Amino acid sequence: MSSERDLVNFLGDFSMDVAKAVIAGGVATAIGSLASFACVSFGFPVILVGGAILLTGIVCTVVLNEIDAQCHLSEKLKYAIRDGLKRQQELDKWKRENMTPFMYVLNTPPVI
């Protein structure tokens, strides 16, 4: 049970952190493009682009962590993963008990 809980925590935290990083990266890229255009157009120093990207990434990360904390998104994701694993185990048990061995083999995904 402990290893399953650790797996669920790892998958939930990792998935949520990747989603936050993708969102923050996309927003920072968009802001960086706009800052680059402004620097080229108005003659500002190009170092401002890096600062804008860094500041945007930090702000996005803080905002996304706050949204996660307020809406409990990580906990909901972990609950959904835990529920999905439980349902998968129930389905596998039903298949073992109710299907012929031939059909069970046909309906079992290959292990890679």
Curated annotation (Swiss-Prot):
It is a multi-pass membrane protein. The chain crosses the membrane at residues 22-42, 44-64. GO terms for cellular component: plasma membrane. Residues 1-21, 65-112 are cytoplasmic. Keywords: Cell inner membrane, Cell membrane, Membrane, Transmembrane, Transmembrane helix. Residues 43 are periplasmic. It comes from the Bacteria. It is found in: Cell inner membrane. This is Putative inner membrane protein YafU. It comes from Escherichia coli (strain K12).
